[in-house]
Amino acid sequence: MDHAQRERSMRAHWKENRTFQRSIENREGQQTYVFYEGPPTANGMPHAGHALGRTIKDFVARYKTMSGYQVLRKAGWDTHGLPVELEVEKQLNIRGKDDIEKFGVERFIEKCKESVFVYENEWKEFTDKLGYWVDMEDPYKTLNNPYIESVWNILATIHDEDLLYKGHRVVPYCPNCETSLSSHEVAQGYKDVTDLSVTAKFRIKNKENEYILGWTTTPWTLPGNVALAVNPEMTYVKAKQGEEIYVVAKSLANTVLGEAYEVVEEVSGEDLVGINYEAPFDFISLDNGHYVIGADFVTDTSGTGIVHLNPAHGEDDYNAIQAKGMDFVNVVDSKGRYEDVIAPLAGQFVKDSDVDIIKMLAKDGTLYEKQKYEHSYPHCWRCDTPLLYYAMEGWFIKTTAVKERMQENNQSVEWFPNHMRDGRFGNFLDNMVDWNIGRNRYWGTPLNVWVCDDCDKQKSPHSIQELRAFADSDVPEDIELHKPYVDKITFDCECGGKMHRTKEVIDVWFDSGSMPFAQYHHPFENDELFNKQFPADVVIEGVDQTRGWFYSLLAVSTLFTGKTPYKRVLSLGHILDEHGRKMSKSKGNALSPVELIEEFGADALRWALLADSSPWNNKRFSKKTVSQAKSKVIDTILNVYSFYSMYADIDKFNVAEHATDAKTTLDSWILSRLNSVIKEVTTSLDQYDITKGARSIALFVDELSNWYVRRSRQRFWSSGMNEDKKAAFTTLHEVLSKLTQLMAPYIPFVADDIYTNLQGDSVHVSDFPKVDEAAIDEKLEADMQGVLEVIEGARSLRNEVNIKTKQPLAELVVVPNDEQLQSGLQAYTSIIEEEINVKQVSFKKDTADFLDTEMKLNFPVAGPKLGKQVGQAKGKVENFTEQEKEAFLVNGTINVELQDGSEVTLEKEDIIVEKKGQEGYQLFEGNRFVLLLDTNLTEKLKEEGFVREFIRAVQTYRKELDLPVEQRVDIYVNSDENAERILSEFDALIHDGLIINSVQFAEKEDMKQVTVNDTEMGLSIV
């Protein structure tokens, strides 16, 4: 089967046998491991980042299940918010709130409901194909009444504690979406941009040529200037430059004015407070404004030390103006455009107006300087529009009141990577502000606060039942908790007035942050289930969720219960393309996970995501990464299983009938390695180091395939069911069974296919393998590791001189660094001889008899020191006697007499030492040994090499004919006399290497023509 057939077959098998459900039911009564699914939005297609997140979530859940825990996995859908509204606006070809109102809010809401599940089937199919086991039949949905009712209960509880309030503040605002954003939403949308900063001239009233220099990075705010701020504690100067006098901070004078100025007077900031000035523009007139005030937020780290204040677009500006009782003005509308009062720019988007503002300043003579500067600026995380800071009324949750508790809760959380706790996430908590919870939009959980039209009294119902109790008329039985339906419900106020619901819906992050409670409709039902499922043992999402879901979970839980909602967090890195760039459709470098699954299989995709680098690191990812995962790991384990199953079928091996305790050294070694790997992997996975575990497994798969199975082939090929063959079958059966259990969380399809064929039931209802300490033989593993290293080194020597392994060589000389290594290698000399195809492996104490040592002057180091003598020294070094070479190697220094009679001392760094094998010997220098391979070829060695190449040619031809591996055949050869002579002399070797009856020299019809070491011959197999 190819991967697509296998995975399709396994999915059907799991469904038919209820394997996912059984894996949970089998753990009933066991300790619970609590898993939370961060809800995706189903109005967009899944991307590579989703594949990473879902793979790691599935991995952890499978591993913990196999480790004995019951892991409930409830899926979820995030259904509210701006992304849905924007998608619907596109579908309807409308834009903005005015168009929505014209279209009809109720109709718009119905369209939103339809939109949120447009790609639900694609998400389900993707989830299924990826092998992510999560309960998608009973997911929580943030749009459902029970979910919203639980969210209302949390909000009402917060309101009861006076932590939910209405205020007028400067908040981040998206002019495209026409709504404010919370600080954690803002943190997700920063981009590096180039903008213009301006130093403007504010003329002091009643002074002909005296100006205060005010600096701003937002020139578009200058038409709404109300005040200038100085720091009363700072020193300022009045500096004459040309015919004009400028006021600027003393410490910034050189930076702002350059050197061509004269200080007329030094003044304190306090002295400047109260000075009246003329604003650069005269579009607005103020009753109380356009004078200098003192503010401690003004610094001398940049600008002029004097800050222009526009209370509508800066939090510090707003607070300072409010504190002084100065006029509040706003000349920008809700769409981010200048109002008519700014006549030259009316209707123009303010962020596009900086150049026009600067031109107007220059024309009026009030521009001192303009500069380009690069900085990070917040953009809407949903529509990509540059945000404005905008003074408006809104609803806020006083998260600052529970800041310390949130910080304490965070300290109890185990973060992966650890630095996130006190770094990125901890810093965000340190700088948190009250949560701007209200959104002036349509599709979302309605904020459940009713306000009296007359006395401003507020009521917040905890439930639908309370909503009915408060309402002044009957509430429909099927009331839907969305706009515009709940907006029709009014309350009677004690003062005699009417209470209407405030117009806002809530931040969608509060929706998803409430999921620990709302997914089970807490506190209205499922108390026992909720108590078992809170807090989470782990939450897993991308690193950007430090300012998203991770934050909202912690904030909501701390506000509502005082407790942390999770014990540990796995914060995943980004998926990048092979060049290290972020993937995006617009760049054309995005990879579709569904297409990767179709091309390479889900197991290959999963292995590539899990084994390449730690989950919290950014990953460079490409088709090649997935292709290599398939070829190096998935295909290798399948080939090992195919080898086992083919010969087990031929020999009718039955583990229950034929199993034996007998073992060869090779069997003991692979079982020792298996248990060492089980130990390593278990330790890694218990520490959530999934990648380290994968690397241990990958190494073992290679050892199993390229060492154990390859070295054991003759045992499986032997006739009959002897004890040695039983031992090989028994060992490989055990290794494959436990290896597939180890690999099941990584590659669930292949692992289950193999395990089910071996054991009769799914690997996913089995236990993760336990280490058998008694099976671990550290000395045997160390000895065999030495053997493998020697073989690898010797093979590299063959490659250097282009001599194939089929060509036997006379000798491999090994010079080990220590006696223990030599002892281990000597025990397996015959294995090394077979693998390297040498007649003899010999051990020496040193390399003196096999190496030539060459020395030459190190010109970059010795040249400057020797000067004109460098030429003489070069000749001397290159002609050192063996005694001189030995003396230098021992002492690390040598005195050299030059031709002119002078003497120089050469140190270790002055001479380059190169060691080479003597002619006919190839040198390999490893960390623990030196190898010397005799590459001289005698005629007898060449003849044997010819025979081995002949054997390879016959094996290749057998495969082409698709002959059963166990079928014995007769071989007919038609070649020259010399070839026939050689083949006859090595008849025993040919019979050892092939399953044949005989080799006969005769011409047959339709013989296959092959070339063996430049000799042409015809082959026929019958």
Curated annotation (Swiss-Prot):
A motif ('KMSKS' region) lies at residues 582-586. One of its GO terms (biological process) is isoleucyl-tRNA aminoacylation. One of its GO terms (molecular function) is ATP binding. Keywords: Aminoacyl-tRNA synthetase, ATP-binding, Cytoplasm, Ligase, Metal-binding, Nucleotide-binding, Protein biosynthesis, Zinc. Transmembrane segments: none annotated. Its cofactor is Zn(2+). It comes from the Bacteria. Monomer. This is Isoleucine--tRNA ligase 2.
